[in-house]
Regions:
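Acidic-glycine-rich active-site phosphate/pyrophosphate-binding loop
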Residues: 1-14
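C-terminal accessory "lid"/substrate-recognition subdomains
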Residues: 5, 23-24, 51
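ATP-dependent carboxylate-amine ligase
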Residues: 10, 20, 30-214
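A short glycine-threonine-serine/GTX helix/turn-capping micro-motif
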Residues: 15-22
Length: 214
């Protein structure tokens, strides 16, 4: 989340938001102003409840914490601009490495793939390119097209393997963002739909790590 100092009528208030990212803070403040204006009441009446606001599933959603203390976030970003926005939003929350796992969907917007790779290579410290929903396309070809924009990234076929690699890279102060699928619960590969959810897989991996430690 984030702690924010907000000045209202000359008085400074400290508020906490469970939401991550500057743009989400601005959205909350805009909504706060609209509600206050509509109901004719003071903004102060709503400040104490801001910490109860829940984010949209799959939108910069915090899904777990690695044993090292590193937070793990998922997001639906699947365009260069969206990927840029989330990486820029997450950077202030990272003291160590920003690790990004992402792919690109098949059968659409092929021209965006190298640009997504370029964005990740510039804004993330570790980039792992993997499969999204390849649909009827070759997953390997999609990854290779992304890699044109980030030749130093790690190319990992299989989303679960890529996420596992991302988790293994985490240390105290790091943050892992898994982009592209958000809260989706299925993956489309070669005309077949299989169950897969980023958050559920991460939780299974974290449970295994905790079990090994115990």
């Amino acid at each position: 989340g984030q702690h924010v100092e907000l000045e209202v009528n000359g008085v400074i208030f400290e508020i906490h938001l469970s939401l991550i990212g500057e743009f989400q803070l601005f959205n909350v403040l805009a909504a706060l102003g609209l509600v206050s204006a509509e109901e004719g009441s003071e903004v102060l009446n709503y400040l104490e409840n801001l910490d109860k606001i829940k984010g949209v599933p799959g939108r910069l959603e915090h899904i777990g914490t690695h044993p090292t203390g590193a937070p793990i976030v998922v997001d639906y970003a699947h365009t260069p601009d969206a990927l840029k926005n989330i990486l820029v939003s997450l950077r202030p929350h990272v003291k160590g490495k920003l690790v990004c796992v992402f792919g690109a969907g098949g059968d659409r917007d092929k021209e965006k793939r190298p640009f997504m790779g370029k964005v990740a290579s510039v804004l993330a410290d570790i980039t792992i390119v993997t499969d999204d929903n390849p649909r009827s396309e070759s997953p390997m070809v999609i990854r290779e097209e992304i890699m044109k924009g980030c030749p130093s990234a790690q190319n990992v076929g299989g989303r679960s393997e890529a996420i596992s690699l991302g988790l293994s890279n985490l240390s105290d102060g790091d943050l892992l963002v898994i982009a592209g699928k958000g809260h989706e619960t299925r993956q489309e590969i070669a005309g077949t739909t299989i169950p897969f959810n980023d958050a559920a897989f991460v939780q299974t991996q974290l449970n295994d790590v905790v079990g090994e430690v115990q």
